[in-house]
Amino acid sequence: MSQAKHVAVLKGGWSAEREVSLVSGKGCAEALRKHGYRVTEIDAGRDLADQILKVKPDVAFNALHGRWGEDGCVQGLLEILRVPYTHSGVLASALAMHKERAKFVFRAAGLPVAESVVVPREQAAHGHVMDPPYVIKPVSEGSSVGVFIVRAGDNRPPAELTSAEWNLGDEVMAERYIAGRELTCAVMGEEIFGVTEIIANTTFYDYEAKYQTGGSRHIIPAPIDADIYAEVQRVTLAAHKALGCRGVSRADFRFDDTRPGKPELILLEVNTQPGMTPTSLVPELANLAGYSYGELVSWMVEEASCDR
C-alpha cells in the first residue's frame, strides 16, 4: 500500500441515482477498511468542497453516480483542490455522460453505434421523431433512468415526457431500437475483462431490472461465439481509450442475433462510474479475472491521481 492511506469515499449526492450511489459507497468503504485503509464516508452535498477540506483525505474514492458526480463536475472540483481521485478525469467523464457527444467520439474512432437524433423533450412528447421502434433516453443520465421504448403501433409517447415532475433535462435522444441480447464488458487500466450477458426479467434492462432483487440474471462468461466475444472486448477497450478514460470503465452493448447471417453488435455507452456494490457487474467481471472485490477497489485507490 502507498502512503495514501486516508480515503474519502464520496457517495450519495443529489442526482436521480442517489440511492444506487449510497449502496456503492458503502460497499467500497467496507472493503477498503478491510484492506487497511482509513476511510471517511462523505454523503456529498453542495458543501462538498468544505467537507473535503475539513477531512483532508489523501485520496477521494468517487462512488457518485449520475449528474454532478459522474459528468466532470466533481472531478473538476477535486482537480482544483488537488485531491487525487479514482476513475476518469474531467473531459472523459463529461464526454461519456453526454450520450450525443460520446457518439461523436465513437463514430470518429470507427466504433459501431446506432442511428439517433437529439430533440427537445416537447417534440418527442407530441409525435414520433423517427420510425419506431426506437428508444427515448435523457441525454445525460445513467442507470436507465428515464428510458422508454416506443414501439410500432404506439399512438402516443410515454406520459412521463409531459409530466411536470420530469427533471432529466430539456433534450432527449431517440435511438434506433436494437433487438437481441444485452452484453457488457469492463476495463481496468489496460486490462480487458470478460463479457457478461444480462437477461432482464422485465421488458428491458431498466432501472428496476438493474437494482431490484431478482430483476435480472448475469451470465458470466456470456454464451456467445468466440469472435463476437473478442469483438466486444476490442470495442470496449477502444471506446475506453477514445474517450480518454482512466481506471475502471464499463461498456454496454446490444447484440442482435435475431437475423440469420446478419448479426449486429452495437455499442450503447461507456459508464465511467459503474456500479460498485459487491454484486455489481464490474466486481463480478473482476472476480472472473481473478481479482477479489477488495483487490479491485484497492487497485483503484492506488491508481488515483489528478491531472486526468
UniProtKB/Swiss-Prot annotation:
Name of a matching Pfam family: Dala_Dala_lig_N
Binding-site positions, Mg(2+) 2: E269, N271
Any one annotated GO CC term: cytoplasm
Top-level class of the enzyme under EC nomenclature: ligase
TM segment ranges: none
BP term (GO), one: cell wall organization
Catalytic activity: 2 D-alanine + ATP = D-alanyl-D-alanine + ADP + phosphate + H(+)
GO molecular function: ATP binding; D-alanine-D-alanine ligase activity; metal ion binding
Required cofactor(s): Mg(2+); Mn(2+)
Coiled coil: none
Main localization of the protein described in the UniProt heading: cytoplasm
Location of the protein in the cell: Cytoplasm
Pathway: Cell wall biogenesis; peptidoglycan biosynthesis
Sites where the protein binds ATP: 130-184
Domain ATP-grasp as annotated: residue spans: 103-302
Function: Cell wall formation.
Protein name: D-alanine--D-alanine ligase
